[in-house]
Structures are given as C-alpha cells and as structure tokens.
Amino acid sequence: MRTLAEYEELAAAAHGHLCAGQILGLRMAIFGLELLGIQEPEGKDRKRLVTFVEIDRCATDAIPVVTGCRLGKRALKFRDFGKVAATFCDLETARAVRVAARESSKALARELFPEICNRNEQQMQGYRVMRVEDLFAHQWVRVELGPEEFPGYKGARRVCEECGEGISFERQVVENGRTLCRHCAGARYYTPL
C-alpha cells in the first residue's frame, strides 16, 4: 500500500481537486483493507475485493484510488443511501466490513485545528491526523452476492421485447410473459421526449 500523501496526489488527479471528502474516502478504504488483511489491492489481491459505496460524493471518488475497484470492472457497487460509508467484501474469505464516517469527526477537526478558519482545510487537516476510531465506526457484515454480481460474470444477454435494447447481468424484468428492460417496465430515471 502507498502512503496517505501518495494516495492524496492520485485522488486529486482522479477527482480534479483535493478536499476533506477525498481524505475521508482514502482513510476509509485504507482502514477497510487493513481490517480485511488485504495488502496489495492493485497487485496480488486485486481480484479479492468488491466494494459497495453508499454516497455519490467526493469520498466515493477516493475509495477506488486505494482499492482498485472500478464500476467497469464490476468490483465497485453503488447503493445510494446518502451515507459516507462503504462495505469492503473479501471474496476469498467471504468476510465483509462496513465502515462509516462518524459525524462527530467534523467537531473534532474544529477542536484539533481551531486556528484554521476554512472549514474544508480544517477538516482536511483533522482527517489526516485523527485516530481511525475517531473517524470511523465499523461493523462486520455479511453481503450475499448472486453470481451475476461478481466481476467476470458472463451471463446470457437478453433483448427487451419493447425497445429492442440489450440487457446484461440478469437485469431484465418479466411482465406478462414478456422480457423487458427495467426502463420499459417503468423504472426509468428519465422521461422520453
């Protein structure tokens, strides 16, 4: 694993800037991997890990910098719960740990660095030096993944009988005997014009 400073450089390049959320995400991922005993996430351990993130904010961009998990590799999963939290799943040992940022860490950053007026700078400095137990709560959990959720899954591709678009990874819906994509089954996030 790299140093926090090295990860910060990589995170800033990936995200476009460095902020408190990035440092939080980096430390969260480092902690999660330490708990699981994964030492080389981009080396020998790269196929052992699936990570679930729970928010679409800065911390989520930092987590893959440490873990190597990517959406396109099917090793990064997004579940929108609006929480600065992530669950790190070791596929080799079937162990998983959920790590969540403590809300109290913001106040602790103010206590540690009262001389810094800029809140983001204050939190960045605080998150760099805080004890991991002051930054995060963690809980051992079980995450049950179907085979279609694993990296490398090569399931059958279906075709939506309504729009004709292809559907991968068992994401189809069957309604009245018809195979539909989720959009045509009514789960659109957009409205056709």
Model regions: which residues?
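Short, flexible, mixed-charge glycine/proline-rich loop motifs
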Residues: 145-157, 170-175
